[in-house]
Each structure stands twice: as structure tokens, then as C-alpha cells.
């Protein structure tokens, strides 16, 4: 039985932290995933502490830092880190097999600019990331909670938008993607109303998939099912 923090919000977008106990059915680690965690965690793993990271110490350099919330199995995150060696990348994922897979792929790819948390993303963002320190925050294909009674569980809410804004540098970007059209409309409504942001779309809607975001398995699945994919990018201006 695992204690897992789940995000829940009231009708005004106020973040309500709730602790729910449930069995985390994430599957067993493969041998390769377990070996990757054992061998790569000392180098790429970040142990959670409620103290802001010193990014220059963590990465051994000064560089723009990109943070991804919920990287799944990590394939696209590793690809981004490989494609942009001049940037630092931090990924957060609660599912251990995903962490193991990401570390395995990162080791094979030889990336040195990636660090990983196996922890609740809200706690990391709130306490372990310094204000004004990030060049980009990425949230790709979050759970859409498509039933109306579950909409309050969606992570993109007014208070979350403000939390992300506080962690971005001026000029930093909050980049979201979803294959659920109604959720994209919800994201757009929340973000267009969020103070201190500017929509990077020319018509204040969505943007084409930028080159820096690789196609993911979720996106491929959406295409197979005849779904579209919507990218939203909002720049912190204040």
C-alpha cells in the first residue's frame, strides 16, 4: 500500500492537497529498468528535499533548464535532452518503471544533461524548484479526467498556472500538449485567464507542434484513434 498525493482542485481552481492510500498498480520493474536505477541513480537521480535546488551545482554549469512533469517512460524527454545538449533537463515521474526506462534510455543515449525525480510533481515544483529558475515547463498528455465530475482533478487549473508562472523566468514558456480536445479547450480557458502570461499562438488558441517536442507514443496512439493533438504555449511576461 502506497501513500500517493493526488491533485484536486475546487471550482475556483484552488489547489486542494489530498492524501489517498491505494495500491499503485504500476507493474514490476524489468531487469533492465532495475539495473538502470541502481547504476544511473547516483548520477542522474534527484532525491527530493523541500529545499530549492542549486541548478548550477546539480548540472555543473549555468544553462537554461527545462522541467517536464510526468514524463511517462521517458523516451521523448531523453530525445529532447540528446537534441539540445546546451540545455539542462529535469523530469518528474511517480511511476518507477518509467523512471527506470528513462534512466536506461538516457544511459544508452549518453546524455549528461538530464536529472530525474521519482516523486510527486506538485511537491517538487512547490518546494524544490526556485522561483524564476526555469526556461520552460512541459506538461505533455496529462490525464484528461474526461468525466465532468472529475474535472476538479485536472492539473491545469488557475492556481497551478500561477505556481508554474512563479517558477519560470521572465520569457520562460509553459508548454502543454493533449490529445483530448475538450481538455485543450479547458487548458486554453484557464491559461488565457491566467495573469502574467501571453499566448504564443497568433490567434490566441493553439500552436503547431514545435520542433523541440518529439512525437510520443501517446500522440501516435491518438493518431491511430483518429484524434487530434493540441499544443499550447504560454510565455511568462510578468
UniProtKB/Swiss-Prot annotation:
Cross-referenced InterPro entries: SAM-dependent_MTases_sf, tRNA_(Gua-N-7)_MeTrfase_Trmb, tRNA_methyltr_TrmB_bact
Signal peptide: none
Binding of S-adenosyl-L-methionine, residues: 68, 93, 120, 143
Residues that, per the record, bind substrate: 147, 179, 216-219
Pathway: tRNA modification; N(7)-methylguanine-tRNA biosynthesis
Top-level taxonomic group: Bacteria
Substrates-to-products reaction catalysed: guanosine(46) in tRNA + S-adenosyl-L-methionine = N(7)-methylguanosine(46) in tRNA + S-adenosyl-L-homocysteine
EC number: 2.1.1.33
GO annotation, cellular component aspect: tRNA methyltransferase complex
Catalytic-site annotation from UniProt: 143
PANTHER family reported for this sequence: 3-DEOXY-D-MANNO-OCTULOSONIC-ACID TRANSFERASE/TRNA GUANINE-N 7 - -METHYLTRANSFERASE, PENTACOTRIPEPTIDE-REPEAT REGION OF PRORP DOMAIN-CONTAINING PROTEIN
Function of the molecule: Catalyzes the formation of N(7)-methylguanine at position 46 (m7G46) in tRNA.
Family under the similarity heading: Belongs to the class I-like SAM-binding methyltransferase superfamily. TrmB family.
The protein's name: tRNA (guanine-N(7)-)-methyltransferase
Organism listed in the record: Shewanella sp. (strain W3-18-1)
Taxonomic path: Bacteria, Pseudomonadati, Pseudomonadota, Gammaproteobacteria, Alteromonadales
Encoding gene (name): trmB
